[in-house]
């Protein structure tokens, strides 16, 4: 099992320094999405006092030519704080700061999908859209081999691992528990965790979150997971099909509701939304992974609890459908629906924006509508 060199350093020595007092100063770790649309970057600055809100945080900049976001001749990019959380690694009063990225001309960077998503969310705020996203991921060694798998073969077939207990069924629970507690400390709206169908595959759920909070909380939860894994010396991958063959892929099932859907006879509005989604399948497939559907093509095969990428389907309690209505929702005739198409490496801002555009703004066609300011 290959682990990183850093994980073999003596953590007790580090703790000697981390327990030193820091006076009135505060360390703020600025986090942003890089030019891949999947990778996260971070750097830290010192503040003179503890910020009470995101509006007290200064803007910053970075070298975009080193993050696939600009040319070297004009490489300064702006970091504009968007959301602030407690820092579970350095602890209070230190902060994690999730940022939007803007180019030299103050236009949003290509992978800053939060900017437009926020505008779209503000247009429908009176409908109180709630989201919950189920983030699946796979633990890997630094050699790219799944954590806990035999070095020269495969574990036993899928079956005993989903929500499994025991050393031969659950691979890497220490990481899952550390991540869970770190998210709770940070103020992330983490709803739960479970072991998934493939060994070394896990899931955590974020939500319910209203509007733009969904993307902020999921991205920072991903960042915390990467940092926890860094300490343990392993890798968390959000690849939607990390192991080819008869193994489950990794998705980011997205649960969605509005105030009307959650109230009596809300099932009517759920069914209306599903009808709208059925007529815009390809638009959503393009929005549901960072490569415009190419990543999901490896996962959405119609097998391993997925729908086929080329077909739209919906059903009650059907995990082989594009859209699943939970059985309890069908019985109570109100609640939410689950879009099972987003890939594990999706951008939650892209996914939630697409759902709002189609279900609430009644957009049709293969391209998003351009609204005036």
UniProtKB/Swiss-Prot annotation:
Region (Required for glutamine-induced ubiquitination by CRL4(CRBN) and proteasomal degradation): 2-25
EC identifiers of the protein: 6.3.1.2, 2.3.1.225
Domain GS beta-grasp: 24-106
BP GO annotations: angiogenesis; glutamine biosynthetic process; intracellular ammonium homeostasis; positive regulation of erythrocyte differentiation; protein palmitoylation; regulation of endothelial cell migration; regulation of sprouting angiogenesis
Amino acids binding L-glutamate: 246-247, 319, 340
MF (Gene Ontology): ATP binding; glutamine synthetase activity; metal ion binding; protein-cysteine S-palmitoyltransferase activity
PTM comment text: Palmitoylated; undergoes autopalmitoylation.
Post-translational modification Phosphoserine, affected residues: 343
Annotated GS catalytic domain residues: 113-373
General function of this protein: Glutamine synthetase that catalyzes the ATP-dependent conversion of glutamate and ammonia to glutamine. Its role depends on tissue localization: in the brain, it regulates the levels of toxic ammonia and converts neurotoxic glutamate to harmless glutamine, whereas in the liver, it is one of the enzymes responsible for the removal of ammonia.
Protein name, UniProt field: Glutamine synthetase
Organism listed in the record: Canis lupus familiaris
Gene transcribed to yield this protein: GLUL
């Amino acid at each position: 099992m290959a682990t990183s060199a850093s994980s073999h350093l003596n953590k007790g020595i580090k703790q000697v320094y981390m327990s030193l007092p820091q006076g009135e100063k505060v360390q703020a770790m600025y986090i942003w999405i890089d030019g891949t649309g999947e990778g996260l970057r971070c750097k830290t600055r010192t503040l003179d006092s503890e910020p009470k809100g995101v509006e007290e945080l200064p803007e910053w900049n970075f070298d975009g030519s080193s993050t696939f976001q600009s040319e070297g001749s004009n490489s300064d990019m702006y970091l504009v704080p968007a959301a602030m959380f407690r820092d579970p690694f350095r602890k209070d009063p230190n902060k994690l700061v999730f940022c939007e990225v803007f180019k030299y001309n103050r236009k949003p960077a290509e992978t800053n999908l939060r900017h437009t998503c926020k505008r779209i969310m503000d247009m429908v705020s009176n409908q109180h859209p709630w989201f919950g996203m189920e983030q699946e991921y796979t633990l890997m060694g630094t050699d790219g081999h799944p954590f806990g798998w035999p070095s020269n073969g495969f574990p036993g077939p899928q079956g005993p691992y989903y929500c499994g207990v025991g050393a031969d069924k659950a691979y890497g629970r220490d990481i899952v528990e550390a991540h869970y507690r770190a998210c709770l400390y940070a103020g992330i709206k983490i709803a739960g965790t479970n072991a998934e169908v493939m060994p070394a595959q896990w899931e955590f759920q974020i939500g319910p979150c209203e509007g733009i909070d969904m993307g902020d909380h999921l991205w920072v939860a991903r960042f915390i997971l990467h940092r926890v894994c860094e300490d343990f010396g392993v890798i968390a991958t959000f690849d939607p099909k990390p192991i080819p063959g008869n193994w489950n892929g990794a998705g980011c099932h997205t649960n969605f509701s509005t105030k009307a859907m959650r109230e009596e006879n809300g099932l009517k509005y759920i069914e209306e939304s599903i009808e709208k989604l059925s007529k815009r399948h390809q638009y959503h497939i393009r929005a549901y992974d960072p490569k415009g559907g190419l990543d999901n093509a490896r996962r959405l095969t119609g097998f391993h609890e997925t729908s086929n990428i080329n077909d739209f389907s919906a059903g009650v309690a059907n995990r082989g459908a594009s859209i699943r209505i939970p059985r309890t929702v069908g019985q109570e005739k109100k609640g939410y629906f689950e879009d099972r198409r987003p890939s594990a490496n999706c951008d939650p801002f892209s996914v939630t924006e697409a759902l709002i555009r189609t279900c609430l703004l009644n957009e049709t066609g293969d391209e998003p509508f351009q609204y005036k300011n």
